[in-house]
Amino acid sequence: MRLEGKVCLITGAASGIGKATTLLFAQEGATVIAGDISKENLDSLVKEAEGLPGKVDPYVLNVTDRDQIKEVVEKVVQKYGRIDVLVNNAGITRDALLVRMKEEDWDAVINVNLKGVFNVTQMVVPYMIKQRNGSIVNVSSVVGIYGNPGQTNYAASKAGVIGMTKTWAKELAGRNIRVNAVAPGFIETPMTEKLPEKARETALSRIPLGRFGKPEEVAQVILFLASDESSYVTGQVIGIDGGLVI
């Protein structure tokens, strides 16, 4: 098993890409600290993970609440002694064209998608530094690379995640901590289910492979970056988009 003995913290762990990653990590023997804002979704996740080789340990976690993050991270380290892998996956959308976007919608997306990644990473990294080992995987988006009309806030947040990924890769390499990002395209998740049919058709027409991706396909790449198989990979942004950005 590729993550046997590893303690892995995943945010946004109870739906979409986060859920698929949590279940895959548990299948690969990890102890998964599943952080999510929804207790109901966490309860469902734990039931689904029953019988897997690893373990799912759920925590209600809001990535905008620094006090709560600190408390959860301290509890995890006290209980398990370490955090080997961090997957920053929690994210939201509040779409609108630039001239119609409300300031509160800008703030909400930036606070979760960008500052939330900063918040959790800043709390976890000191323990990885003490261990002199760790892998951080940030979930960005192809929208952070090429932009998308109606997603000023989302594009800015995901571009910022890429910038932080590359900066942290340089800062932390000397402590044997690797930092990478994935940039999913259109993936079948609760977030993309909200797309109008016309928008879905337009998106599909731009994807060379002719379909939306599955959360499990993103999870497989996150697993590679989290595992020792990618021990010489850091500062990279891996597109998982069916050829969208070719």
Swiss-Prot record:
GO terms for molecular function: 3-oxoacyl-[acyl-carrier-protein] reductase (NADPH) activity; NAD binding; NADP binding. PROSITE patterns: ADH_SHORT. It catalyses: a (3R)-hydroxyacyl-[ACP] + NADP(+) = a 3-oxoacyl-[ACP] + NADPH + H(+). Pathway: Lipid metabolism; fatty acid biosynthesis. It comes from the Bacteria. Disulfide bonds: none annotated. Keywords: Fatty acid biosynthesis, Fatty acid metabolism, Lipid biosynthesis, Lipid metabolism, NADP, Oxidoreductase. NADP(+) binds at residues 62-63, 89, 154-158, 187. One of its GO terms (biological process) is fatty acid elongation. Substrate binds at residue 141. Coiled coil: none annotated. Its EC number is 1.1.1.100. InterPro entries: 3oxo_ACP_reduc, NAD(P)-bd_dom_sf, Sc_DH/Rdtase_CS, SDR_fam. The active site is at 154 (proton acceptor). CDD domains: BKR_SDR_c. Catalyzes the NADPH-dependent reduction of beta-ketoacyl-ACP substrates to beta-hydroxyacyl-ACP products, the first reductive step in the elongation cycle of fatty acid biosynthesis. Homotetramer. Belongs to the short-chain dehydrogenases/reductases (SDR) family. This is 3-oxoacyl-[acyl-carrier-protein] reductase FabG. The lineage of its organism: Bacteria, Thermotogati, Thermotogota, Thermotogae, Thermotogales.
